Structures are given as C-alpha cells and as structure tokens.
Amino acid sequence: MDTARTATIHRVTSETDITIRLDLDGTGQSRIATGIGFFDHMLTALARHGMFDLDIEAKGDLHIDFHHTVEDTGIALGQAFVRAIGDKRGIRRFGHALVPLDEALSEVVADISGRPYLAWAVDFTRDKIGEMDTELFEEFFRAFAMSALVTLHVTQKAGRNCHHIAEASFKAAARALRMATEADPRAAGAIPSTKGVL
C-alpha cells in the first residue's frame, strides 16, 4: 500500500461540532477531547491498540446529556475510516481479537465488507461508569459500524467490573480493526471479495 491511508472529517450539526483526523498506518498516537472523560479514555485505548493515529475534538450539547456527542463521534469516526481505507485493495478484510482485562474478557470480530451491522452482546450491571451512561457504548459502536460500513460482533465472554468490560471491548475492537485493515502480503493489491468489489 503505497498511498497514505488518512482522512480528516469535520462534521457539524445543531447538536455537535466534531473534527477527526485519522491515519490507519500510524503508531497509536492520539489527542482526544470530547468533554467526556471516560469516553476519551476509551478512544485513546482504541487508537493505541489499533496503532491508529487519531485526533478527535468534539464539542457537543453535554448540558443535555452525552448521547449526541458519543453517537456523532461514532458517525464521524466511521466516515473518516471509510475515506481512509479507500477501495480496500490488498487488505485482510477480516479481523478478530480476544482481549482480557483482569477478570473481563471481550471478543470482537470485524469484517470490512461494505455491509454495516453491529451484533452487541455486552452486559453492564451499572448504569454509569464515571459520568458516562453505559448504554452509550453500544450507541457508539453502532454509529461507527453503520458509518464505516463494517460488520462488528462485540461479545463479552467474562467480566464483572464494568470499567474492565468496557475497556476490554474497546481494546478488542482496536486489535480486530487493526488486523482487518492491515495489508495482506499474499493479496497483491486485490479486492478481498469473490465479487470483485466491497
């Protein structure tokens, strides 16, 4: 892959103003500022373990709640992902990861298929982690999957601590997406589909 796989997205609505810069072939560097501390922590982990360089600046109506900012960040990140990945020539397409964090174990399987779907099987026993509603993690991953045109299966295999469960899920997503976006040395620049297009 000789061309840079980078993208910049600036998405503005009446509820949020989000700028994202993404480099799929980075070193895991990030600058994340969404105004939501725990969400920043998760996005930093996503960049670090995906080896993506990622800058996110999000301003949203946090005085209402965090929903719009979290969902719109997922949408904008998905848009950046689509633009950066290009025509998908030579990528592995599929990725999977099992990631532990103490007692928690999360599995993520990814397919950069052009067919957006999220299967979510994660159970949080608390409504919030810090100030963030735990139901918003599913909203983020759904918004990302739909906008990035990827299939994601996110499954909690074990865990009791909600912080650990969330973090293991983000790290597993990072590793699965890293695998799926990497160059396949045997693919010789081919589209990874029998249809010839994704």
Swiss-Prot record:
Q: Which SUPFAM superfamilies match?
A: Ribosomal protein S5 domain 2-like
Q: Which UniProt keywords apply?
A: Amino-acid biosynthesis, Cytoplasm, Histidine biosynthesis, Lyase
Q: In which pathway does it act?
A: Amino-acid biosynthesis; L-histidine biosynthesis; L-histidine from 5-phospho-alpha-D-ribose 1-diphosphate: step 6/9
- In short, the EC number is 4.2.1.19
Q: Looking at the record's lineage, which domain of life comes first?
A: Bacteria
What PROSITE patterns is this protein classified in? IGP_DEHYDRATASE_1 (PS00954), IGP_DEHYDRATASE_2 (PS00955)
Top-level enzyme category? lyase
The protein's GO terms of the molecular function aspect are: imidazoleglycerol-phosphate dehydratase activity
Mention any one GO cellular component term assigned to this protein in its UniProt record.
cytoplasm
* A single GO BP: L-histidine biosynthetic process
Which compartments does it reside in?
Cytoplasm
Q: Which reaction does it catalyse?
A: D-erythro-1-(imidazol-4-yl)glycerol 3-phosphate = 3-(imidazol-4-yl)-2-oxopropyl phosphate + H2O
Which NCBIfam families does the record cross-reference, listed alphabetically? Answer: PRK00951.1-1, PRK00951.1-5, PRK00951.2-1, PRK00951.2-4
Q: Which family does it belong to?
A: Belongs to the imidazoleglycerol-phosphate dehydratase family.
Q: What is this protein called?
A: Imidazoleglycerol-phosphate dehydratase
> What organism, scientifically named, is this protein from?
Gluconacetobacter diazotrophicus (strain ATCC 49037 / DSM 5601 / CCUG 37298 / CIP 103539 / LMG 7603 / PAl5)
Upper taxonomic lineage: Bacteria, Pseudomonadati, Pseudomonadota, Alphaproteobacteria, Acetobacterales
